[in-house]
């Protein structure tokens, strides 16, 4: 079943099934555990009642409100479900999910895969009968996802690729008919951006050290990196569309010991490509 903006999956072939993710919370309500979208609970309840289906497990890919918002409504309709909610880093009253944990019902064996990066608690679920992967928000049916921790996210994408699943069931968008290709696209997209940014910083370092022009510096600010890669863009485009993701790349390159920086505001500080011999340093301006 695909309900509203977040895809909700009922998994299994018998009367007892697994539900993966719930609908988004009502945006007018501040608490993510208050009631979600009425249309979602009405549809899912009607489907379960009509087909005489019971839920054995409710699996949540991660904590974001558009995946957990329907939990209170499920419990309000059926209080027995309170003991059947599973999430990595569970909230009060929920059950934990661990990497490799198996959830089984008739026609479906689902294995939990820990895939942090988009969020700290993100899980994917492998449906062994189909060699398919419920990708959560790590890989979408359209466009690209965002990452809270880019380094861990890239590791998770590679872990997902190593599973060899052909089909992907994303939390948003259409079914991914060939998941290996989509994962490769995601990985190449991120790695390509890393290469572009490191190349821009390396060119600036070579220019600053080699030419020794008066006033030429070895590093670049975020805005200058954008200018070097994309040309001149409106400030609002940089601030809202590019800055968050590019800063993530810079932090990852710093953690990978490829880039250093001067202290200060991340948007205004200078970032430097480190020399090979100095890449054992995590931060700082190269001499």
Swiss-Prot record:
The organism's place on the tree of life at top rank: Eukaryota
Required co-factors: Zn(2+)
Note on how the cofactor is bound: Binds 2 Zn(2+) ions per subunit.
GO biological process, one term: secondary metabolite biosynthetic process
Active-site residues, as the UniProt record annotates them: 66
One Gene Ontology term of the molecular function aspect: zinc ion binding
Binding site for Zn(2+) 1: 62, 64
InterPro entries in UniProt: Beta-lactamase_class-B_CS, LACTB2-like_MBL-fold, Metallo-B-lactamas, RibonucZ/Hydroxyglut_hydro, Sec-metab_biosynth-thioest, WH-like_DNA-bd_sf
Pathway: Secondary metabolite biosynthesis
Catalytic activity, EC: 3.1.-.-
UniProt entry keywords in alphabetical sequence: Hydrolase, Metal-binding, Zinc
Record flagged with keyword Metal-binding: yes
Positions of Zn(2+) 2 binding: 66-67
Family: Belongs to the metallo-beta-lactamase superfamily.
Function: Lactamase-like protein; part of the gene cluster that mediates the biosynthesis of neosartoricin B, a prenylated anthracenone that probably exhibits T-cell antiproliferative activity, suggestive of a physiological role as an immunosuppressive agent. The non-reducing polyketide synthase nscA probably synthesizes and cyclizes the decaketide backbone. The hydrolase nscB then mediates the product release through hydrolysis followed by spontaneous decarboxylation. The prenyltransferase nscD catalyzes the addition of the dimethylallyl group to the aromatic C5.
Protein name (database record): Lactamase-like protein nscB
Organism whose genome encodes this protein: Trichophyton verrucosum (strain HKI 0517)
Lineage: Eukaryota, Fungi, Dikarya, Ascomycota, Pezizomycotina
């Amino acid at each position: 079943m695909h309900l509203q903006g977040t895809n909700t999956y009922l998994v299994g072939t018998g009367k007892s099934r697994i539900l993966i993710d719930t609908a988004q919370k009502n945006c007018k309500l501040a608490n993510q555990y208050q009631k979600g979208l009425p249309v979602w609970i009405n549809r899912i309840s009607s489907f379960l009642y009509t087909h005489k289906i019971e839920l054995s497990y409710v699996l949540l890919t991660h904590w974001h409100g558009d995946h957990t918002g329907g939990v209170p409504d499920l419990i309000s309709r059926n209080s027995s479900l309170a003991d059947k909610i599973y999430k990595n880093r569970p909230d009060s009253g929920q059950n934990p999910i661990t990497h490799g944990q198996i959830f089984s019902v008739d026609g479906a064996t689902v294995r939990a895969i820990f895939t942090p990066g988009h969020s700290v608690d993100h899980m994917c679920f492998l449906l062994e009968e189909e060699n398919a992967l419920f990708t959560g928000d790590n890989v979408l049916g359209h466009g690209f996802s965002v990452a809270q921790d880019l380094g861990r996210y890239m590791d998770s994408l590679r872990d997902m690729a190593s599973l060899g699943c052909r089909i992907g069931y994303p939390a948003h968008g259409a079914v991914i008919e060939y998941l290996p290709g989509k994962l490769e696209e995601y990985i190449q997209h991120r790695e390509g951006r890393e290469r572009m940014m490191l190349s821009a910083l390396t060119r600036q370092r070579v220019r600053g050290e080699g030419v020794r022009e008066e006033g030429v510096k070895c590093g670049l600010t975020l805005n200058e990196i954008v200018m070097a890669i994309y040309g001149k863009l409106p400030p609002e485009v940089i601030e809202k569309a590019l800055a968050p993701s590019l800063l993530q790349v810079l932090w990852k390159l710093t953690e990978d010991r490829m880039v250093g920086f001067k202290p200060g505001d991340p948007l205004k500080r200078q970032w430097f490509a480190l020399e090979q011999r100095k890449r054992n340093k995590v931060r700082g301006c190269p001499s």
